[in-house]
């Protein structure tokens, strides 16, 4: 009986340790820190997207929704209400399309852009009232440790 309990305890401890290690890995790999510009008013909860367009695509947000071989890598999380200067992080725990994990992203040069989808009536990244960042050209690698920082500075007019 004692051996059975000891075996169960060790197995449980190993599982907890493995999960903690995996959680730590998600914080160490490629991640995006998106903040709300201090000049903007507080925002309600919404869907936060980061679009990564390879090559010379200057406005990645306009590529959201493409599928198949032309699909643009996009990360998404449900964002809490944001105060000016506050933000959210998108990392390996975020939903990603068209890949299964962010680790599958091919290293290279990308234009990246953040979009905060707030319009509940029109579910489109280009909907009036949504916020977005300026595009940023950056070298991305799934193994990089330094975060990519983006600031939501613009609003799509109503």
Predicted feature residues:
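A beta-strand/beta-hairpin structural motif
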Residues: 79-101
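Bacterial N-terminal signal peptides
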Residues: 5-15
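A short tyrosine-centered beta-strand micro-motif
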Residues: 105-119
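Short beta-strand elements
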Residues: 124-158
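Short acidic/polar inter-strand loop motif in beta-rich domains
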Residues: 56-59, 116-132
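Boundary at the C-terminal end of the N-terminal hydrophobic targeting segment
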Residues: 15-23
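Short amphipathic, basic-aromatic surface patches that mediate peripheral association
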Residues: 32-41, 54-60
């Amino acid at each position: 009986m004692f051996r059975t309990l000891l075996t169960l305890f060790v197995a449980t401890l190993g599982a907890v340790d493995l999960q903690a290690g995996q959680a730590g890995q998600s914080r160490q790999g490629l991640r995006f820190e998106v903040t709300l510009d201090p000049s903007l008013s507080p925002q309600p909860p919404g869907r936060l997207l980061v679009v990564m367009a390879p090559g010379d695509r200057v406005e990645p947000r306009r590529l959201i929704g493409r599928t198949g071989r032309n699909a643009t890598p996009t990360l998404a999380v449900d964002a809490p209400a944001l105060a000016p200067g506050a933000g959210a992080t998108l990392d390996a725990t975020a939903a990603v399309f068209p890949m299964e994990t962010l680790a599958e992203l091919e290293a290279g040069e990308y234009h990246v852009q953040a979009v905060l989808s707030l319009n509940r009536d029109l579910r489109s990244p280009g909907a009036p009232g949504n916020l977005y960042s300026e595009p940023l050209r950056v070298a991305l690698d799934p193994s990089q440790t330094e975060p990519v920082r983006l600031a939501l500075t613009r609003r799509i007019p109503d």
